[in-house]
């Protein structure tokens, strides 16, 4: 598979991963490039993303998603220190579309079981196809509305999906006890935070720097309040 997996893309990916402080194996680099190739190949058929240019796909999608991997890895590692927690973690990526960031999480965090849910059948089918092609047994595509999923998932993530109040309300029943939400946003969403109900708490906000992307990015970590 070599639609975009040429030397220049590999170099840009390696440089981006280094800038993010990400330690990736050769197999993971190959899987990420192959995923990018799949995304470009099937985008015309499935309409997975409005971004058509391969270079923009690398920056706006792949590196943007990779920026969230170090925070996720830290959370999973901290969770693993809890003797009561089961090994690894189950993650639900809501409104995953073409698998961003869900597929990237599955590649870079093999100890995490990732389910990507989307209401569009062909997008969920693409995730299943990507799982098979890339050899990711920890990746699953689900065609459903998130409100219908029971979980339990230790982390429920989204990227440019919906307002925080809607995201947390629609996915709350899928969250495991002591589970958390991970929301990827652009600018700090002060208004969205102010609109959250009293039983949802933002406990951490991380500013992200995406290599090659001159735009504000942040991650919000949220949890239910008893």
UniProtKB/Swiss-Prot annotation:
Protein's UniProt name: Ribosomal RNA small subunit methyltransferase G
Gene Ontology cellular component list: cytosol
Enzyme class of the recorded protein, top EC level: transferase
PANTHER family associated with the record: S-ADENOSYL-L-METHIONINE-DEPENDENT METHYLTRANSFERASES SUPERFAMILY PROTEIN (PTHR31760:SF0)
GO MF: rRNA (guanine-N7-)-methyltransferase activity
S-adenosyl-L-methionine recorded as keyword: yes
NCBIfam families in the record: rsmG_gidB
The entry's keywords: Cytoplasm, Methyltransferase, rRNA processing, S-adenosyl-L-methionine, Transferase
A family per Pfam: GidB
Function per UniProt: Specifically methylates the N7 position of guanine in position 527 of 16S rRNA.
Entry EC no(s): 2.1.1.170
Organism placement in taxonomy: Bacteria, Pseudomonadati, Pseudomonadota, Betaproteobacteria, Burkholderiales
Organism (species): Acidovorax sp. (strain JS42)
Family: Belongs to the methyltransferase superfamily. RNA methyltransferase RsmG family.
Subcellular location: Cytoplasm
Source organism superkingdom: Bacteria
Catalytic activity of the protein: guanosine(527) in 16S rRNA + S-adenosyl-L-methionine = N(7)-methylguanosine(527) in 16S rRNA + S-adenosyl-L-homocysteine
């Amino acid at each position: 598979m070599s639609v975009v997996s040429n030397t220049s893309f590999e170099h840009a990916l390696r440089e981006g991963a280094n800038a993010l402080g990400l330690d990736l194996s050769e197999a993971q680099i190959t899987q990420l490039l192959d995923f990018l190739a799949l995304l470009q190949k099937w985008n015309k058929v499935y309409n997975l993303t409005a971004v058509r240019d391969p270079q923009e796909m690398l920056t706006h999608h792949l590196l943007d998603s990779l920026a969230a991997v170090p925070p996720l890895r830290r959370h999973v590692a901290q969770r693993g220190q809890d003797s009561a927690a089961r090994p690894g973690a189950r993650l639900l990526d809501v409104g995953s579309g073409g698998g961003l960031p869900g597929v990237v999480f599955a590649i870079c965090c093999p100890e995490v079981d990732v389910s990507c849910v989307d209401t569009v059948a062909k997008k969920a089918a693409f995730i299943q196809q990507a799982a098979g092609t890339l050899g990711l047994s920890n990746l699953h595509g689900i065609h459903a509305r998130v409100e219908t999923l029971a979980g339990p998932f230790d982390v429920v993530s989204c990227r440019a999906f919906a307002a925080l109040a809607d995201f947390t309300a629609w996915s709350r029943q899928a969250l495991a006890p002591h589970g958390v939400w991970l929301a990827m946003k652009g600018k700090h969403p002060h208004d969205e935070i102010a609109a959250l109900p009293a039983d949802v708490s933002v406990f951490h906000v991380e500013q992200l720097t995406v290599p090659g992307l001159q735009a504000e990015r942040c991650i919000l970590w949220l949890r239910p309040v008893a």
